[in-house]
Amino acid sequence: LFIELDALEVCAKALRFFSINRFNVLSFHERDHGDGAGDLNGWVRTHLKRAGFVADGPIFIQCYPRLWGYVFNPLSVYYCYTNDGTLEAILHEVSNTFGDRHTYLLPVSPAAEAGPIHQSCAKKLFVSPFNPVDHRYDFKVHPPGERYAIGIREFDCEGEVLVATFDGHRQVLSN
């Protein structure tokens, strides 16, 4: 699912089998993301402003929707734009099977906006018993377009220990 946070209700009204914050064949629940309190758009904008970003443009989320009420989003990606259309930051929200979440808010260099975008950060959340927290993530993101791709490489002090990728092509969600 790739959707603008300001357009959630509009999309739900237009689609028979898609709902926001209630059960349906496909649904998006704001409590599945962010701090779980409900106002996801406000939560992301507050997060951005606290980190010194402008946060005045559209915010899109790339994630899995609930399917018949069930979902697991190991990674949700928020694309945060300014009013002039500049991709300012990407918020990577990592979840584990225990229901814990951690966000990695990373700036996007104007030179990298055309893609692919490379970002790195220290790992902060226990995700797997096979990979401890003292690792580093490298994200490689192709900006949203007709094609969507993201790669995550995890490193320890000796080198690469995990590679995960997702690659897809945009399809319009319809009835």
Task: Show the residue positions of the predicted features.
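Mature, function-bearing regions of proteins
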Residues: 1-175
